[in-house]
């Protein structure tokens, strides 16, 4: 194993540049499909460090950067999209930096930069020691929406020997838990408009169809397999009450423990939509917006990450960083703080501290209700992930608190630690062929043919 302290020192020497990239992207958040500036920052940076950059046509702002030759292909995935309406200053009070603007409440400014640290550090040490191997950085836009599914379908990840990534969180742990599969789609109902007071009999209400469809989903819930969740909103309910609505729409999310459960559920949902139109003499169409498979962790890589995370020195917070973390933590309700730890089996007594300053190993055998586009990649190649405590304990993703924390100096320290861990793990994979062999053996033993949940 490469000396972890040596790797950490190399990363520390470039800390101003890495922190600057993370802060720059945090200060200039771009939502899914609009990450032109953010992706350009990474492409230009990687090109300047000797990586060859290839942009992918199937998805705007997606790319691959590669450096090195021969040996195994060790890849890292980086994200950089922000969330709409989540603007927040780096402070302990809810205060948008720009009202209604996006913000990095999922910490993707950190995720992309941390994976950049890993790719550059691994490429440096492999070349310095004359070790063969290709290091890749995949730029993955729109994680909060469509995700990297077009890249998976195009086979962009298929020839990688191992892929790793990470995410900001409130604990330091390998990501052993699985995620839920999902599909999101809009059901659009078409009726016939008429005057609701003068000639209601001449109209056919698309809103009636949408409401009957939604009611059918409510009655269906009881008879779905455990773990299947339905969430919906009426995204179009008509324009005025005195017009029989010609158009209406329901925006629906379907979640399931594993991807192969989605098609059967969707067959029943399609029947419900058809039934609603028969009752109202309307018609319907549907538009699939996104879909993600469940994440299937490769435990050979997860075990390696846990081993490495125990050797790379954890960062130390300053007094100011600890004070900031305490102030942010205090803005989260006591019960809400537990919601970040309980799903992955982390002990709740961790909440006595503002920052997780030790190494955990949580989530084995657990599944979270959320969905990750990393899941689709894990169906085609061995994938491992880790979490780093970029946020105070009890602070969850997609909150103003996580957005504030993601712009802090502590978050940048945790980001560099995560990148260092990923680099050291990549070095182990590149130099110990038995690890790659074992990871692939595990992958093949559990392999399920890939089918996107969008392919209904």
Q: Language-model segments: which ranges?
A:
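A short small-residue
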Residues: 2, 20-24, 94-101, 189-197, ...
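Acidic/His- and Gly-rich active-site-bordering loop/insert found
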Residues: 2-104, 109, 113-133
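General structural feature for long, well-ordered alpha-helical segments within catalytic domains
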Residues: 3, 14-21, 34-45, 72, ...
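Divalent metal-coordination and catalytic microenvironments
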Residues: 25, 76, 108, 137, ...
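Short Gly/Pro-enriched turn/cap motifs at secondary-structure boundaries
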Residues: 54-55, 175-179, 364-368
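Histidine/acidic-residue-rich, glycine-tolerant segments that coordinate divalent metal ions
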Residues: 63-64, 83-85, 92-103, 109-110, ...
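Non-cysteine beta-strand/loop elements that form the S-adenosyl-L-methionine
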Residues: 75-77, 190, 386-389
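Metal-dependent amide/peptide-bond hydrolase catalytic core
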Residues: 211-456
